[in-house]
Swiss-Prot record:
The chain crosses the membrane at residues 8-28. GO terms for biological process: photosynthesis. The gene is psbJ. This is Photosystem II reaction center protein J. It is found in: Plastid, Chloroplast thylakoid membrane. One of the components of the core complex of photosystem II (PSII). PSII is a light-driven water:plastoquinone oxidoreductase that uses light energy to abstract electrons from H(2)O, generating O(2) and a proton gradient subsequently used for ATP formation. It consists of a core antenna complex that captures photons, and an electron transfer chain that converts photonic excitation into a charge separation. The lineage of its organism: Eukaryota, Viridiplantae, Streptophyta, Embryophyta, Tracheophyta. Signal peptide: none annotated. Its main location: plastid. It comes from the Eukaryota. PANTHER family: PHOTOSYSTEM II REACTION CENTER PROTEIN J. Belongs to the PsbJ family. It is a single-pass membrane protein. Keywords: Chloroplast, Membrane, Photosynthesis, Photosystem II, Plastid, Reaction center, Thylakoid, Transmembrane, Transmembrane helix.
Length: 40
């Protein structure tokens, strides 16, 4: 493992940033299939 002292690992940034994005896209498509896409 490389020394990441004072630095934030890129995989951590990707995970933290990716979860809300994937969740938002998932909710958007779920709402569209449920007929609630217009409310978004």
């Amino acid at each position: 493992m490389a020394d990441t002292t004072g630095r934030i690992p890129l995989w951590l940034i990707g995970t933290v940033a990716g979860i809300p994005v994937i969740g938002s896209v998932g909710v958007f498509f779920y709402g569209s299939y449920s007929g609630l896409g217009s409310s978004l």
